[in-house]
């Protein structure tokens, strides 16, 4: 990826009111994107958002910029990120825009784009938009200005899409499901999908007020969900994040089931039904137990860098259709073009219904190895991971862990931190090894 000023791996993101998440920048970004897309023959762009209060401000500014460049905008209102990927395709729009900062707190927001195919914009288009941002803003002739409209049935369309991914011969009658929508974009989608498939649904995190998105709820904090599942004697709990592209689950005993376990359940079911194409892509942070469990099934496994963008890249590279992260981003490429929390959760529920097994039973094949993560701050300058002393300690630890665990040493891309991760079946050994490496890193300081 070329050096970017604004676009990161997941669009433009930051604190609301601080550049670039300001109304004037959103206006200019809408105009710049409009100019570039119009030059490709575009006429209409979809705009969706999550439930943050700043979404109103940003969607209005983006729409004004697009209109000035001659493009019309269609608003969907609060809608999960994967819904915008899907709706952009089905509405034959030239692009889709999502206003969201995913799992971040309400005071952050972001703007990202989808292509007409519902995939991330090609790098060259993002680079052209960045270049256009440096140009003075102008306005097309009045007769050529874009218009704004609202899509009133966007939620209903996406609900039907989600239900369509669930096997027609199965239903969720008899299941009691607690769903936590993080007070985010799935609040009016997920409960309806589950009810229409026959489940009894108990809702938490479905009362957004613009400020409570991801606050002690959703995929990043399942504590309330665990308590509610146990209290109501539910069969399963589902937790989505603020923009609906992540899923975490809770079994009937209140145990958290993470993205690695969810990925395994979906992979095994796809293998059984003959629908698994190739292998599975995880990340550098995927638990070693996932790799071992897949190996026992004869399923190839590859690790990508952390980030759903990199998972998807490796899937495309290998022509595989399944990948994900332990954080709950699960991409089932033959169903949607991006991580889709609702679709992934339905795939797991279908496996439960098909085999009449509990989530606890399905997840038991992946007994997660303890992971010890230590962040070591350093003074900047030389990267401690390049030091011979650190390399020597790391090599000695790797030898000790051979066959039983692994280490991962990463320099943070945003802070002067070295992240030391040790994973091992033996929790004490993992802790000891992580501390040894962390100590070696500290000495370099």
UniProtKB/Swiss-Prot annotation:
Pfam families: PGM_PMM_I, PGM_PMM_II, PGM_PMM_III, PGM_PMM_IV. The modification Phosphoserine is found at residue 102. The active site is at residue 102. Keywords: Isomerase, Magnesium, Metal-binding, Phosphoprotein. Mg(2+) binds at residues 102, 241, 243, 245. GO terms for molecular function: magnesium ion binding; phosphoglucosamine mutase activity; phosphomannomutase activity. This is Phosphoglucosamine mutase. The gene is glmM1.
């Amino acid at each position: 990826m070329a050096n970017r000023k604004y676009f990161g791996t997941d669009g433009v993101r930051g604190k609301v009111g601080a550049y670039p998440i300001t109304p004037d920048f959103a206006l200019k970004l809408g105009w710049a994107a409009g100019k570039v897309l119009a030059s490709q023959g575009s006429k209409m762009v979809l705009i969706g958002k999550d439930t943050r209060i700043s979404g109103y401000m940003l969607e209005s500014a983006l729409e004004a910029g697009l209109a000035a460049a001659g493009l019309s905008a269609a608003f969907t209102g609060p809608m999960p990120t994967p819904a915008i990927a899907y709706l952009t395709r089905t509405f034959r729009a030239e692009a889709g825009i999502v206003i969201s900062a995913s799992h971040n707190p309400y005071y952050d927001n972001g703007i990202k784009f989808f292509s007409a195919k519902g995939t991330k914009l090609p790098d060259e288009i993002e680079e052209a938009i960045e270049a256009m941002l440096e140009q003075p803003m102008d306005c097309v002739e009045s007769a050529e200005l874009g218009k704004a409209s609202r899509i009133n049935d966007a939620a209903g369309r996406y609900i039907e899409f989600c239900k369509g991914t669930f096997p027609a011969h199965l239903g969720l009658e008899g299941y009691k499901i607690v769903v936590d929508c993080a007070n985010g974009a799935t609040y009016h989608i997920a409960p309806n999908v589950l009810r229409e498939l026959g489940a009894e649904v108990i809702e938490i995190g479905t009362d957004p007020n613009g400020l409570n998105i991801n606050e002690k709820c959703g995929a990043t904090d399942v504590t309330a969900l665990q308590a509610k599942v146990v209290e109501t004697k539910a069969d399963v709990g589902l937790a989505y994040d603020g923009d609906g592209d992540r899923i975490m689950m809770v079994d009937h005993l209140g145990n958290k089931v993470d993205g690695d376990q969810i990925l395994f359940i979906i992979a095994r079911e796809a293998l059984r039904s003959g629908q698994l194409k190739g292998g599975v892509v995880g990340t550098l942070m995927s638990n070693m137990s996932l790799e071992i469990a897949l190996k026992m099934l004869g399923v190839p496994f590859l690790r990508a860098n952390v980030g759903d963008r990199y998972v998807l890249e490796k899937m495309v590279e290998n022509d595989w259709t399944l990948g994900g992260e332990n954080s709950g981003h699960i991409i089932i490429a033959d169903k949607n073009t991006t991580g889709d929390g609702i679709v992934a959760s339905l795939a797991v529920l279908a496996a439960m219904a098909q085999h009449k097994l509990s989530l606890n039973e399905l997840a038991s094949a992946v007994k997660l190895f303890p992971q010890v993560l230590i962040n070591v701050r350093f003074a900047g300058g030389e990267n401690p991971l390049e030091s011979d002393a650190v390399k020597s300690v790391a090599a000695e630890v790797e030898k000790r862990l051979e066959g039983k665990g692994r280490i991962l040493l990463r320099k943070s891309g945003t802070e002067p931190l070295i992240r030391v991760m040790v994973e091992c079946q033996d929790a004490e050994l993992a802790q000891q090894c992580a501390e040894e490496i962390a100590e070696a890193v500290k000495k370099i300081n």
